[in-house]
């Protein structure tokens, strides 16, 4: 089945010597996905993070990660990913952040969540792989020498002006902001 072709039948029989090489298949795939610029190819071809444990993204996680990376490579700035409980949302967020960071297109990343438990879990598990490039924003103190920041919404702003530490970051300071579990925040807080 060739879903990339426009003027040929979807299904044709090929002999083994007619079958496209991996390079030809990759070229067709890139055209089909609109990955035509070298920069876009560099972003989309950046591999996942593998820690040697054998853990790999599940098929549905790969779909979410790859579609997000492809959308960003094409210039899309806002992306909503919806996943059910227990499907590995934090791992997906980490893989997206890692691939974009490693490709060099997103150098400063902010991961926002609504509660400390989510930040602690992300810091302890998936995001630990950023090592000394990562920090958790605590006690309303910011060190701008890091590349990856994990914070809770309430830790960046408050009802009093001096608690609004988000103002210490200039507009555009972050290249990528991951707002984790936004629906919960939207429904239960006055942040709307």
Locations of regions flagged by a protein language model:
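ATP-dependent helicase/translocase motor core
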Residues: 1-108, 113, 117-133, 144-148, ...
């Amino acid at each position: 089945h060739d879903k990339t072709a426009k003027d040929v039948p979807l299904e044709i029989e090929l002999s083994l010597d007619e079958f496209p090489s991996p390079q030809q298949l990759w070229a067709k795939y890139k055209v089909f996905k609109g990955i035509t610029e070298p920069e876009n190819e560099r972003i989309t071809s950046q591999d996942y993070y593998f820690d040697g444990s054998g853990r790999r993204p599940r098929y549905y996680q790969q779909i979410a990660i790859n579609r997000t990376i492809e959308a960003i490579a094409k210039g899309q700035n806002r992306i909503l990913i919806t996943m059910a409980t227990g499907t590995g949302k934090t791992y997906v967020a980490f893989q997206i952040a890692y691939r974009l960071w490693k490709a060099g297109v997103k150098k400063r990343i902010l991961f926002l969540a609504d509660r400390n438990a989510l930040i602690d879990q992300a810091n302890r598990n998936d995001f630990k792989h950023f090592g000394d490039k990562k920090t958790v924003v605590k006690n309303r103190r910011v060190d701008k020498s890091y590349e990856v920041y994990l914070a809770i919404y309430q830790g960046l702003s408050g009802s009093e002006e001096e608690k609004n530490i988000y103002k210490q970051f200039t507009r555009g300071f972050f290249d990528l902001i991951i707002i984790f579990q936004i629906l919960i925040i939207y429904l239960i807080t006055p942040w709307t």
